[in-house]
Amino acid sequence: MAKKQFKAESKRLLDLMINSIYTHKEIFLREIISNASDACDKLCYQALTDDSVKLTRKDFKIDLSVNKDARTITVTDNGIGMDKEDLENNLGVIASSGSYKFKQEVGDDTKDTDVIGQFGVGFYSAFMVCDQVTVRTRKFGSDTAYQWQSSGADGYTVTECDKSDAGTEVIMHLKDDTEDEHYSEFLEEWKLRELIKKYSDYIRFPIRMAVTKTKKVASCMSDKPDEVPYVEMETLNSMVPIWQRKKADVKPEEYNEFYREKFHDFADPQRVITVSAEGAVTYKALLFIPGTTPFDFYTKEYEKGLQLYSSGVLIMDKCPDLLPEHFRFVRGVVDSPDLSLNISRELLQHDRQLKVIAGSLEKKIKSELAKMLKDEREAYETFWKNFGRQLKYGVVSEYGIHKDLLQDLLLFWSSTEKKLVTLDEYVSLMKEDQKVIYYAAGDTVDKIDKLPQLEALKDQGVEILYFTEEVDEFVAQTLRSYKDKEFRSAMDGASDESAQEKAKEEADTHKDVFAFVKETLGDAVAEVKPSTRLKSHPVCLTAGESLSFEMEKYFQLMQPDSSIKAQRILELNTEHPAFTALENAVTADPEKAKIYAKLLYDQALLIAGLPLDDPSGYTDLVCGLMK
């Protein structure tokens, strides 16, 4: 028995592959089982095309066994097997894939099979955890069996052996444990179950293992039953993925159970989205919109992405490239036989197929959300409560490139409707002479509703959108307009010519009072002017056009040391008794007028939700008036 050397610069290539190509040692089992699945698929295909092969898909299986004393894991299949030439070509030449050649030979006729292998290197991943691998195989239709054995880069041997049935068994002898690596865990039943469930759950053939269980039997010595151990062959994998089944054949509770188990959620999903695409790229997808917001969703720790499978084999647990950032809340799986994988089958090559799938999924998710908004408003508002903020972030991100896609999905509170409305609903209810979309920002709907700056618009029956999240004003700035109607803050002041003319008259009539207040407050305010919007309140603060008070609060929250501040424009209601008292004091008692001016400014700060410049000074002023 002569030892043969691997071909193709074997020592360097095998060492490179073992230490560089794969990043997770545990995937060795995925690769060996995928090879076994390919072997079964090849014989299954032969049975479909050759009447002399009396086998059906139900006849095939993959068995997994462990010998802890010998430190071996054995994977056995009853697939097509190999002869001596196959062993030389497939295992003696690194990076020679028999499965790939098979797919090339039969072409489109493999549509009913799930042949996985492409590169011919997966088998050698076993050497990441093993110091010796033995392959015993007999090709279907042959009377001779062969044994291939290797300890790695030193070469391999091929000899005849005894094997009664067609198929292949791969016997992997695990390395000894080290301080850094605990290879013995791969001999444990729980670990093997975990790996099968994680990587090979949807292999289309049963993966079986002899499992020791216990059952209760009546005891002749005690009233309590005895627990007697017994061994049972248990199928570890699901075989048929739920996303491969027809939607009509799957009950809603099955989808819910799959979601909860797969994504470790206690709540059912709010929405289930199924996709089956054929064409340039063939794939199936099963997507879920969660029923609740994940606790870490709005944190940096949250990882977006869909589980990615290739022909039922897990390739990536979370593939971020399949979801745009604005739909990062979606969970689910994508399975495609058309993906261009890299040599380790761990990472996806960034290619056209992936982009096509991602683009298609984005359109599908948008379509489902739009349908929910139209037909199930209450359900959509529940979704909006959970993930609406993410859609807003999507509008403002990447310089607004996604705004046209997302703008019709947005909801804001309406001052007149007293409920959430879309931008389209707002525009459809606008007065004929209204040229802009008004909005007002604040911490809560109640606080915004009480803002004195809104009194005039409310009296006119103008609808105002209430912005209660820090991102809302950035959304308005990014959109700029909707259906040719520009966004305008309700805090911006008079917009019609008559109101502007009246403001000019008031400013001229009371110019001494405004000048006095400005001089008293100094740089605390940029301007003091008459208000055209106040009705029952004496004073309010408005901001300049570049930055609002809510944006100032946001920047202060993000950067506490930030010096960015909105302009402070003090508006006074010339028809309010407080203004009359101020005007009289300017002439009769300038010192008291200064107190009035400071009090009015502090009141305006409080109404705007801004911190007082001098809280102690404010209380002193109030107490002074009470003497």
Give the positions of each predicted feature.
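GHKL (Bergerat-fold) ATPase N-terminal catalytic module, capturing the glycine-rich phosphate-binding loop
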Residues: M1-F186, E194
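GHKL/Bergerat-fold ATPase module in large chromosome/replication-associated machines
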Residues: V115, R136-G155, K175-K627
